[in-house]
Amino acid sequence: MSEQNNTEMTFQIQRIYTKDISFEAPNAPHVFQKDWQPEVKLDLDTASSQLADDVYEVVLRVTVTASLGEETAFLCEVQQGGIFSIAGIEGTQMAHCLGAYCPNILFPYARECITSLVSRGTFPQLNLAPVNFDALFMNYLQQQAGEGTEEHQDA
């Protein structure tokens, strides 16, 4: 009889936490006197690291900048962290789990934190739309594949 690989995929959330919060309203209070027609910029970034065997930290950084013309109305940054137990997967599946699946779990927490900070700054309510981290991850893989192709063509 041949030996079978009985490694099952396991995924468990150990902890979700706020790692860092920053809110700045550098032009308050005079920014409150202006017409509220902001240009809102959303910036996302993820980072992951292995803490122990099958234990990973994933940090989602969400930065929102609202500007009125040349002036910054507010800048809000949240780093939402999570510790996850992940076993039984590797390679591209692990990269997808750390780069898309975990950020999908963390984003609602970061979004709620940003909404609360903006509200406490007495700015109009900010509703961030859901983010498709799976699509962002696929775009990232396509960019990496394109860069790899260009490197081989240059050689």
Curated annotation (Swiss-Prot):
Chief location category: cytoplasm
GO CC aspect terms: cytoplasm
CDD domains, alphabetized: Translocase_SecB
One of the GO BP terms on file: protein transport
Disulphide bridges: none
GO molecular function: unfolded protein binding
Record Pfam families: SecB (PF02556)
Gene3D superfamilies xrefs: SecB-like
InterPro entries the record matches: SecB, SecB-like_sf
Compartments where found: Cytoplasm
Keywords: Chaperone, Cytoplasm, Protein transport, Translocation, Transport
Keyword Chaperone: yes
Homology family: Belongs to the SecB family.
Function: One of the proteins required for the normal export of preproteins out of the cell cytoplasm. It is a molecular chaperone that binds to a subset of precursor proteins, maintaining them in a translocation-competent state. It also specifically binds to its receptor SecA.
Subunit structure: Homotetramer, a dimer of dimers. One homotetramer interacts with 1 SecA dimer.
Name by which UniProt lists this protein: Protein-export protein SecB
Species, as recorded: Escherichia fergusonii (strain ATCC 35469 / DSM 13698 / CCUG 18766 / IAM 14443 / JCM 21226 / LMG 7866 / NBRC 102419 / NCTC 12128 / CDC 0568-73)
Designated gene of the protein: secB
